[in-house]
UniProtKB/Swiss-Prot annotation:
GO terms for cellular component: cytosol. ATP binds at residues 30-37, 147-150, 176, 184-187. Transmembrane segments: none annotated. Pathway: Cofactor biosynthesis; (R)-pantothenate biosynthesis; (R)-pantothenate from (R)-pantoate and beta-alanine: step 1/1. It comes from Maridesulfovibrio salexigens (strain ATCC 14822 / DSM 2638 / NCIMB 8403 / VKM B-1763) (Desulfovibrio salexigens). Belongs to the pantothenate synthetase family. It is found in: Cytoplasm. GO terms for molecular function: ATP binding; pantoate-beta-alanine ligase activity. GO terms for biological process: pantothenate biosynthetic process. Catalyzes the condensation of pantoate with beta-alanine in an ATP-dependent reaction via a pantoyl-adenylate intermediate. This is Pantothenate synthetase. The active site is at H37.
Amino acid sequence: METISNPQELQNLCLMLRAEGKKIGLVPTMGYFHEGHLSLMDAARKQCDVLIVSLFVNPTQFGENEDLDAYPHNLERDSELAEKRGVDILFTPIRDDMYFEDHSTWVEVPDLATNLCGKSRPIHFRGVATVVTKLFMTAQPHVAVFGQKDWQQLAIIKRMVRDLNIPVDVQGHEIVREESGLALSSRNVYLTEDEKSVAPNIQKGLQKMRDWVTAGESDAAKLKSDLVEFYAETIPTGRVDYIEIVHPENINILKNVGDSALCAVAIQLGNARLIDNLLIKV
């Protein structure tokens, strides 16, 4: 495995690889790998001749008073895990390599970025869309794989690629969970033992909502109200940031559950902001 930190060096290499007919896969990450990240690498590895994993804690997607400085990192551990997974290139740029001091160009997908996480994190998806565009330009991938835990992010990137005619096949990969049902996240390390014991109720609540829909309830307001009550009982130390039922592609908030709907939640539990979702098909 080769480690490259200079964007121009990686771009030159990838342009050469494409000219040679090599199929390039990219898995963008912020590091501190867990089995969720590794499953994305596996999915991309099966499809590509060259697998690139980027490791960059992108400062432009963090707002004030968020956890940029505290975000967990362990480059040595991540490098070992990536190499064992068959990664060919680990891309590890620093901030000054990715953003000039007078950086002034941003990529935004406002129609999909105002609900869910975008409501409480107004600059988040601008930073995500911009850095992913830069990674696509640098790594020149044919395929890029993202986790479905960040469903809104995935929808935004798919729309961005469609609207800007970026020649990348953007794929979503199913959520990987702990045995308890808690969605894997690098931020799970922030949880205390007590918090970790109640966090699996996030997924259980989503499953409850699916059961309510299956039983015939379609009113989104009623479903959300019932889920708020469930979380108040089962995660009393948590604070609900949002519970929404949205269209899975355009992220518009739904008043009634139709043939397909995404229930998405975000809960602040101690120092960890945990997100999860469940696609409900009637």
